[in-house]
């Protein structure tokens, strides 16, 4: 096998052969159409080293001149009104920005959101049950996370269809000149700004109101409020969509595992963790840049070199996981060695919320739709053509 192609329908459907080729070699210089390149880290041990390395920073300003000129960062990386959030920050700024949101993801709020997730899921499954068929992506995996993250943030109902439509565009791989992503970013920035302004006038009990209150005390700047709200709105639902869709597919195609998960909540939890490992809704961790010479996997990475950690490749590394390419929830029950949510200080703040929604969705599907089956052959399913997130366009079922 020659050097693999890391984009296209075949790769989207099954990236394992490409990643196996890459893991046999030191970190790879991955070229982009812009003419620039980045180090791609694919081995589990190297990924853990990179994600924990104190000399690898997140601030886009740390990228070298070639990367800065290339425009490889999302458009929002270069807008103060959208880039001033925790993903682009390093301690102590990262610590301050993360702390500003932490209360919204605490145990008490998670219990409230579990009850809301159950209500939303029941309503969505009611509709599928009444029709006798459905699409578990459009009928469940999308509307549930959007409803929950908008509830948490305090985004009114009238904006939610726009959130769905335009966030899809941001992850599109067919936007060769970036114009669609810029348009989507503009629309969603205006949406978030409108909601923030409304909360400044009348605060509620939601996260955006909390952020606005911290702005009033000087803890956060106006740009940090908007950036944080934007980050959580987009990042807080897209990966959960992928988790629910790919987990539902795994249950539909592994009836023995579905039967165990139906009876045992612990096995259902193992299904969620194995889905996160095998399908890693966030395929690649966000950019990192060395502040000094750093050696990882036998390669020396220079200050400013852009680095991507392939979470999906690392999670399928046979050096770290037995039967790494297979769905084996029982074999790995109780383990959380995968890096689907990252590790270290940048561990995803919404990890518990994503797991909660997946648990509610899977428990409800297994209980209420026990005879659900795929309505098309599995090989006909199409995967998102995204270098960022992993998920399905559709998951049609019959009852």
State each model region's role:
Residues 1-399:
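Cytochrome P450
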């Amino acid at each position: 096998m020659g050097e693999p192609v890391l984009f296209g329908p075949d790769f989207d459907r099954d990236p394992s052969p490409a990643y196996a080729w890459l893991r046999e070699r030191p970190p790879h210089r991955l070229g982009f159409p812009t003419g620039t390149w980045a180090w791609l880290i694919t081995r589990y041990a190297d990924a853990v080293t990179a994600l924990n390395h104190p000399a690898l920073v997140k601030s886009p300003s740390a990228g070298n001149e070639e990367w800065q000129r290339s425009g490889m960062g999302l458009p929002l990386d270069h807008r103060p009104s959208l880039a001033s959030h925790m993903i682009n920050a390093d301690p102590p700024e990262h610590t301050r920005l993360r702390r500003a949101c932490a209360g919204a993801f605490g145990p008490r709020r998670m219990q409230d959101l579990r009850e809301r997730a159950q209500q939303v899921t029941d309503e969505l499954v009611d509709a599928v049950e009444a029709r006798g068929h459905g699409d578990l992506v459009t009928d469940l995996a999308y509307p549930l996370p959007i409803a929950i993250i908008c509830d948490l943030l305090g985004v009114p109902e009238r904006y939610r269809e726009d959130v769905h439509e335009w966030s899809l565009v941001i992850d599109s791989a067919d936007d060769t000149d970036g114009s669609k992503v810029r348009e989507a970013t503009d629309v969603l920035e205006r949406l978030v700004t409108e909601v923030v302004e409304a909360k400044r006038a009348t605060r509620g009990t939601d996260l955006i109101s909390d952020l606005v209150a911290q702005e009033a005390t000087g803890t956060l700047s106006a740009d940090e409020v908007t950036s944080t709200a934007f980050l959580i709105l987009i990042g807080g639902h897209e990966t959960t969509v992928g988790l629910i869709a790919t987990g539902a597919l795994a249950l539909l195609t592994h009836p023995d595992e579905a039967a165990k998960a139906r009876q045992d909540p612990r096995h259902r939890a193992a299904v969620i963790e194995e889905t996160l490992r095998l399908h890693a809704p966030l395929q690649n961790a966000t950019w990192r840049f060395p502040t000094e010479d750093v050696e990882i996997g036998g390669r020396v990475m220079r200050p400013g070199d852009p680095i991507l950690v392939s979470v999906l490749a690392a999670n399928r590394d046979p050096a770290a996981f037995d039967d790494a390419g297979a769905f084996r929830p029982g074999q790995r029950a109780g383990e959380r060695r995968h890096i689907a949510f990252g590790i270290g200080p940048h561990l995803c703040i919404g990890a518990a919320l994503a797991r909660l929604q997946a648990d509610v969705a899977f428990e409800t599907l297994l209980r209420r739709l026990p005879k659900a089956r795929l309505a098309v052959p599995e090989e006909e399913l199409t995967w998102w053509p995204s270098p960022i997130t992993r998920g399905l366009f559709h998951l049609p079922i019959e009852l």
